[in-house]
Amino acid sequence: MIHFNVPPFVGTEFKYMHEAVENHKICGDGPFTKKCDEWLENRFKAERVMLTTSGSTALDMAALLCGIKPGDEVILPSFTFSSTANSFVLAGATLVFVDIRPDTMNIDETKIEAAITEKTKVICPVHY
């Protein structure tokens, strides 16, 4: 089997998952979320950080915050999760797919500029 993504394990995962479940804090409003928020705010000197429960939710929020409306174009890689496209389509955008680099599976940065038009509102790279 070829694994698409292998998350790292450091040995404390079950302890922390048990603590979150035991305290009924599994939906993003618990102490672990607060610790992550604070760490990210400090690390990136951000005024405010907001973790989401999924990448799909984060992309939905991004489409809203970018003010995507019908007629706007969004550039994204030709190889990505369906939620990348769905979030912007649901906001009314026209998708512009750009080929990926076979060595990284990420959007081919040398092809982005040719895809930009006066209607381009967002470039949404996805990293693997």
What does each of the following model-derived ranges do?
Residues 29-73, 87-90, 97-99:
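Phosphate-binding glycine-rich loop
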Residues 10, 30-31, 52, 78, ...:
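Short alpha-helix boundary/capping motifs
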Residues 64-128:
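PLP-dependent aminotransferase-like
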Residues 3-5, 13-14, 36-37, 60-63, ...:
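A generic local structural motif
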Residues 1-26:
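N-terminal "arm"/small-domain region of PLP-dependent enzymes with the aminotransferase-like
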Residues 11, 56, 81-82:
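Alpha-helix N-cap/helix-start and coil->helix boundary motif
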Residues 3-5, 52-53, 124-126:
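Short beta-strand segments
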